[in-house]
């Protein structure tokens, strides 16, 4: 029989930089998970994606064992990296902070495809363009 799930924890952690300090420690400590075991495994799995924030879904079982799934980085993080900016615009309708080429948007959409519920790359591109628009980033051809 399959192990009984007692908790699902969703976190966004910088790649290769998980440590027992907040937010990781308290979230996993409540579930009774071996925090250092998770940190070592997460850091090993995400070492090649340094500098990006990686969403992770941790499933905790009754016997306090766990499994986790890493997702693709949020579109906003990938857009900020592509545009070379620290943060988006506070007033995206008035202040535009950067421009990104459409081929870069396609690249981001292809990266995000496994996590998006889009039927095609074009639909995924529209989702990424929407995220860019709400951050004050202009898309140009």
Swiss-Prot record:
Domain of life: Bacteria
GO molecular function: large ribosomal subunit rRNA binding; structural constituent of ribosome
PTM: One or more lysine residues are methylated.
UniProt organism field: Bacillus cereus (strain ATCC 14579 / DSM 31 / CCUG 7414 / JCM 2152 / NBRC 15305 / NCIMB 9373 / NCTC 2599 / NRRL B-3711)
GO cellular component: cytosolic large ribosomal subunit
Function text: Forms part of the ribosomal stalk which helps the ribosome interact with GTP-bound translation factors.
Name used for this protein in its record: Large ribosomal subunit protein uL11A
Signal peptide: none
Any one Gene Ontology BP term: translation
The keyword RNA-binding belongs to this UniProt entry's keyword annotation: yes
Complexes and interactors: Part of the ribosomal stalk of the 50S ribosomal subunit. Interacts with L10 and the large rRNA to form the base of the stalk. L10 forms an elongated spine to which L12 dimers bind in a sequential fashion forming a multimeric L10(L12)X complex.
Claim: Membrane is one of the keywords in the record: no
NCBIfam families in UniProt: L11_bact
Alphabetical keyword list: Methylation, Ribonucleoprotein, Ribosomal protein, RNA-binding, rRNA-binding
CDD domains found in the cross-reference section: Ribosomal_L11
Protein family per UniProt: Belongs to the universal ribosomal protein uL11 family.
């Amino acid at each position: 029989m399959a192990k009984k799930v007692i908790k699902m924890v969703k976190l966004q952690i910088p790649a290769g930089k998980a440590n027992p300090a907040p937010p990781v420690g308290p979230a996993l400590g409540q579930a009774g998970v071996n925090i250092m075991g998770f940190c070592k495994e997460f850091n090993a799995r995400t070492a090649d994606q340094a500098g990006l924030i990686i969403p992770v879904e941790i499933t905790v079982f009754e016997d306090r064992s766990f499994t986790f799934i890493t997702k693709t980085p949020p579109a906003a993080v990938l857009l900020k990296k592509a545009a070379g900016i620290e943060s988006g615009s506070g007033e995206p309708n008035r202040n535009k902070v950067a421009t990104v080429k459409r081929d870069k948007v396609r690249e981001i959409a292809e990266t995000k495809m496994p996590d998006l519920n889009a039927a095609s790359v074009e639909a995924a591109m529209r989702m990424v363009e929407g995220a860019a628009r709400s951050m004050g980033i202009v898309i140009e051809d």
